[in-house]
Amino acid sequence: MKKNIFAAATLCTLFFVGCNNNPETVVEEFYKANKANDFEKALSYTNIAKEEREEVIDILSDMGMVIHEYKVLGSTIDEGDTTATVDLHLVTSSAFYPDSLADDIKVPCVKSGRQWQVKLI
């Protein structure tokens, strides 16, 4: 009985992980982690190589950017199903610009294997 429950739980997990693999979800999770200052997790949603992430984390920490809010507005997946653009409304501030700045931006994404990633390089 325990084996059946474990197998069912594993299948459900794999199913839901696969369902969330779209450009909008990846961008949402990327900005959610950034807002929480969890840069290591945020970079796990990008195409930055693992060995380069520590340097990028230092840069992000030094920037002092604060994400107040973000909202995915939509996305476009290109014909080849390998690149996408996610439209995002973003409100930020930083030590350099303490007043909130709101902007609609386009976040590029790339597909690596079956996984979508935020394209930073």
List the model feature ranges, each with a label.
Residues 77-121:
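Exposed beta-sheet edge and beta->alpha loop/turn motif
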Residues 1-5:
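Positively charged n-region of N-terminal signal peptides that target proteins for export
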Residues 24-25, 34-87, 97:
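Short solvent-exposed beta->alpha transition segments
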Residues 15-18:
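C-terminal motif of bacterial Sec signal peptides marking the signal peptidase cleavage site
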